[in-house]
Each structure stands twice: as structure tokens, then as C-alpha cells.
Amino acid sequence: MKLTCMKIVAVLFLTAWTFVTADDSRNGLEYLFPKAHYEMNPEASKLNKKQDCAAGGQFCGFPKIGGPCCSGWCLGVCA
């Protein structure tokens, strides 16, 4: 009985602590991702930089996905 009461109190305490320490409890996760999107620096992203890639039809070596080809497909030659 005492253990059950302690568990209930602990869960209520942790739930209250989560809401108290949240950054913006009014909006929750609704505006979390758009805010992060606008704060992101697109020029710092390595995904946008494909300068060191080989064009289609050039030799790329062993067949693999995500290789040196601009398309990301290496089948002996860039696809």
C-alpha cells in the first residue's frame, strides 16, 4: 500500500516537473520544429554540398550506395 502511494506521488511529481521545466508549455511541440527550421543555417549543411561528386557515366569503383557519385548510386559507373 505504501509502495503504491509512493509510486503515485513519484509519477505526479515527475509529471509536474516536466510541465514546469518545459521551455514553452503553452504551445508544446506545435512550433518546435518550424522554429528550429528558421534558426538553421542552410549554408552550413554538408548535405547541400555535392562538389566532390562524379557525374553520371564516370567510373566510381566498387558498386555501392552513397558513393562518390552525385546521384548517390555507384554501379561500377555513376548512375
Curated annotation (Swiss-Prot):
- Which is one Pfam family of this protein? Conotoxin
InterPro entries assigned to the protein according to its UniProt record, in alphabetical order: Conotoxin (IPR004214)
GO terms for cellular component: extracellular region
Show which residues constitute the signal peptide.
Answer: 1-22
- Tissue-specificity statement: Expressed by the venom duct.
Q: Pro-segment residues?
A: 23-48
The protein, known as:
Conotoxin VnMKLT1-01122
> What organism, scientifically named, is this protein from?
Conus ventricosus
**Any idea where this protein resides?**
Secreted
In the record, Pyrrolidone carboxylic acid modifications are located at 51
According to the lineage, what is the superkingdom? Answer: Eukaryota
Per the UniProt entry, the disulfide pairs are 53-70, 60-74, 69-78
User: For this protein, what is any one GO molecular function term?
Assistant: ion channel inhibitor activity
Q: What is known of its domains?
A: The presence of a 'disulfide through disulfide knot' structurally defines this protein as a knottin.
| The family this protein is said to belong to | Belongs to the conotoxin O1 superfamily.
Keyword tags: Cleavage on pair of basic residues, Disulfide bond, Knottin, Neurotoxin, Pyrrolidone carboxylic acid, Secreted, Signal, Toxin
